[in-house]
């Protein structure tokens, strides 16, 4: 009798994706982040669902409802902080996942890569709208500043912003629609993640060497299931350490002040995971230019496959490209730091130089260094 796991239409899909899937024998821990992102998404949907049961998306009661969740709901505090810090873990995994893709040339799977970029935008949009919901000072002013950027679009800008706001400022209508979108987007993200996997399984996984691994495959289960479980345990450990010992470490104290349209906080800044993009936005003195740089700072990932000039896929055997890659990482950390600093000397010039370097590395230096490395192979 044939195993039901391999014949039943439903279990067959699961079997071919997570059990009998042929996987390269040499994929490292950097390949764990896909499954970790899946776990993050599940944690966020579950904690978010329970928060939504007690939250009210009305300007008069939103802040109070979050306070009520933390004080009066059974284990509401842990659900709230798991959701807030779960977003941080989500972005840590996302950045490491994208970084892995850049380092090992996984972007050569263009369909998988492009769906990944769409996923990144969707997660960023979800996180932004979620940050508005507690209706604290940083929620309100963050929403005001970021939505206002759309007014830089010529001709239709102002109308577009007022249409998104549902009025002449960020108000009740804005909060209600942001809650609606924040609720629906994770399910769209789940569907996109399934498509992401579908495209990945068309080609099979890349591996650290960047060399085709068709001749050396092992079954996903038990080898990579046990490896993913270890990764998941470490992820949950890190999340719970954050939640139980310093839940407000990554948050902004201003968000414990209820939203007040008449009082602007001294330093308006987004959550830490948006600071690099915020620094790029602020480094250009022109409003439209800043918005374009902001969008292009993420969208640049879409043209990475076109800029691949190396004869090798992975950076594993390319020491010059490795140096550039780690320079890029250091540059992004610098931008993240600058994004959280006030707009004054010397932070302005550091931010501008770091922004120029970011685009220089990806658009100019990487392709040139790859060509140099190709020529070095001939020596």
Curated annotation (Swiss-Prot):
Cited InterPro entries: Cyt_b/b6_C, Cyt_b/b6_C_sf, Cyt_b/b6_N, Cytb/b6-like_sf, Cytochrome_b, Cytochrome_b_C_euk/bac, Cytochrome_b_N_euk/bac, Di-haem_cyt_TM
Endpoints of the signal sequence: none
Cofactor(s) the protein requires to work: heme b
Record keyword Coiled coil present: no
Protein localization: Mitochondrion inner membrane
Annotated binding of heme b b562, by residue: 83, 182
The organism's place on the tree of life at top rank: Eukaryota
Keyword set, alphabetical order: Electron transport, Heme, Iron, Membrane, Metal-binding, Mitochondrion, Mitochondrion inner membrane, Respiratory chain, Transmembrane, Transmembrane helix, Transport, Ubiquinone
Membrane topology reported for the UniProt record: Multi-pass membrane protein
Cofactor binding: number and manner: Binds 2 heme b groups non-covalently.
GO molecular function: metal ion binding; ubiquinol-cytochrome-c reductase activity
Transmembrane regions listed in the UniProt entry: 33-53, 77-98, 113-133, 178-198, 226-246, 288-308, 320-340, 347-367
Positions with a binding annotation for a ubiquinone: 201
One CC-aspect GO term: respiratory chain complex III
PROSITE patterns: CYTB_CTER (PS51003), CYTB_NTER (PS51002)
Binding site for heme b b566: 97, 196
Subunit details: The cytochrome bc1 complex contains 11 subunits: 3 respiratory subunits (MT-CYB, CYC1 and UQCRFS1), 2 core proteins (UQCRC1 and UQCRC2) and 6 low-molecular weight proteins (UQCRH/QCR6, UQCRB/QCR7, UQCRQ/QCR8, UQCR10/QCR9, UQCR11/QCR10 and a cleavage product of UQCRFS1). This cytochrome bc1 complex then forms a dimer.
Other remarks on this protein: Heme 1 (or BL or b562) is low-potential and absorbs at about 562 nm, and heme 2 (or BH or b566) is high-potential and absorbs at about 566 nm.
Family assignment from sequence similarity: Belongs to the cytochrome b family.
Known function: Component of the ubiquinol-cytochrome c reductase complex (complex III or cytochrome b-c1 complex) that is part of the mitochondrial respiratory chain. The b-c1 complex mediates electron transfer from ubiquinol to cytochrome c. Contributes to the generation of a proton gradient across the mitochondrial membrane that is then used for ATP synthesis.
Name of the protein in question: Cytochrome b
Gene, per the UniProt record: MT-CYB
């Amino acid at each position: 009798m044939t195993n039901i796991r391999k014949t039943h239409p439903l279990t067959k899909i699961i079997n071919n994706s997570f059990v009998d899937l042929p996987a390269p024998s040499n994929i490292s821990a950097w390949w764990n982040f896909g499954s970790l992102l899946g776990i993050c998404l599940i944690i966020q949907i579950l904690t978010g669902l329970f928060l939504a049961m007690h939250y009210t998306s009305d300007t008069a009661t939103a802040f109070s409802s979050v306070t009520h969740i933390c004080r009066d709901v059974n284990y509401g505090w842990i659900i709230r902080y798991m959701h807030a810090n779960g977003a941080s873990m989500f972005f840590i995994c996302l950045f490491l996942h994208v970084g892995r893709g850049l380092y090992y040339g996984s972007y050569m799977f263009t369909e998988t890569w492009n769906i990944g970029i769409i996923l990144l935008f969707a997660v960023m949009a979800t996180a932004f709208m979620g940050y508005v919901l507690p209706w604290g000072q940083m929620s309100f002013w963050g929403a005001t500043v970021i939505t206002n950027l759309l007014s830089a679009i010529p001709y239709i800008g102002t109308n577009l912003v007022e249409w998104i706001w549902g009025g002449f400022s960020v108000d009740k209508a804005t909060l209600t629609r942001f809650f609606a979108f924040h609720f629906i987007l994770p399910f769209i993200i789940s569907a996109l993640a399934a498509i992401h996997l579908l495209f990945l399984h068309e080609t099979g996984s890349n591996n650290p060497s960047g060399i085709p691994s068709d001749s050396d495959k092992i079954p996903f289960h038990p080898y990579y299931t046990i490896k993913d479980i270890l990764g998941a345990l470490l992820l949950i450990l890190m999340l719970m350490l954050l939640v139980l010992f310093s839940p407000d470490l990554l948050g902004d104290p201003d968000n414990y002040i209820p939203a007040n349209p008449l009082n602007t906080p001294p330093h308006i800044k987004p959550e830490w995971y948006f600071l690099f993009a915020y620094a790029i936005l602020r480094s250009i003195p022109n409003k439209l230019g800043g918005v374009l740089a902001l969008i292009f700072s993420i969208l640049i990932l879409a043209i990475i496959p076109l800029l691949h000039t190396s004869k090798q896929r992975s950076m594993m055997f390319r020491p010059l490209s490795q140096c550039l890659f780690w320079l890029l990482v250091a540059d992004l950390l610098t931008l993240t730091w600058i994004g959280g600093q006030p707009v004054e000397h010397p932070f302005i010039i550091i931010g501008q130089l770091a922004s120029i370097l970011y685009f220089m590395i990806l658009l100019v230096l990487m392709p040139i260094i790859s060509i140099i490395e190709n020529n070095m192979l001939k020596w």
